[in-house]
From Swiss-Prot:
Belongs to the complex I 20 kDa subunit family. Binds 1 [4Fe-4S] cluster. Its cofactor is [4Fe-4S] cluster. PROSITE patterns: COMPLEX1_20K. GO terms for biological process: anaerobic electron transport chain; anaerobic respiration; formate oxidation; glucose catabolic process. It comes from the Bacteria. This is Formate hydrogenlyase subunit 7. PANTHER family: FORMATE HYDROGENLYASE SUBUNIT 7-RELATED, HYDROGENASE-4 COMPONENT I. Gene3D superfamilies: 3.40.50.12280. The lineage of its organism: Bacteria, Pseudomonadati, Pseudomonadota, Gammaproteobacteria, Enterobacterales. Keywords: 4Fe-4S, Iron, Iron-sulfur, Metal-binding, Oxidoreductase.
Amino acid sequence: MSNLLGPRDANGIPVPMTVDESIASMKASLLKKIKRSAYVYRVDCGGCNGCEIEIFATLSPLFDAERFGIKVVPSPRHADILLFTGAVTRAMRSPALRAWQSAPDPKICISYGACGNSGGIFHDLYCVWGGTDKIVPVDVYIPGCPPTPAATLYGFAMALGLLEQKIHARGPGELDEQPAEILHGDMVQPLRVKVDREARRLAGYRYGRQIADDYLTQLGQGEEQVARWLEAENDPRLNEIVSHLNHVVEEARIR
């Protein structure tokens, strides 16, 4: 029973759980093995269900967390990652510790949402113990009330080291000394973004991006070149889209 209540200091006050150095080194090896997949167990410590709604939205086909190998499991004994939501209430402190102790080492702990991070707006209630880090060691904090699905995926990417992989990724034949090419560098970046967004709004993501690139390339050689390009293409739909893009450019020049 004392293990379920957790460690206490000399005055009998409960203190957060800790892990020794061997488990910390095992956690580093775990990250190498689960970079492409992870089993997650959710621990509700006493939240309002707002965070749960966003978690389920993250698992929906729209955001599709499983494309990163993130899967929810029904038991902490199957989990690589424990996701703690809500402020830790006194009633849920022992069940949360049981879940943490049931998950095999090494494991990754994520504190989810403002309540999980610090207790949130409930931090000073008599029945609230505090944030997740008051009972277990936390590896990643995902702030928000509640966090968006995009922030949720970002937090999982941080936990799994996916962002580090993306940052240091190299393409085929990519050289360190090869500078990155900036497309349409003669135009200011906000204007390039506006033209690209307008073209994608009118023609869809794929063809809109292609039209925006072609338009900016021709515009860099002068407005006469844009007219010659439209004449060569002889496409009324392209003419209409380019007229909208010309309007975007003219508005930017006036400002």
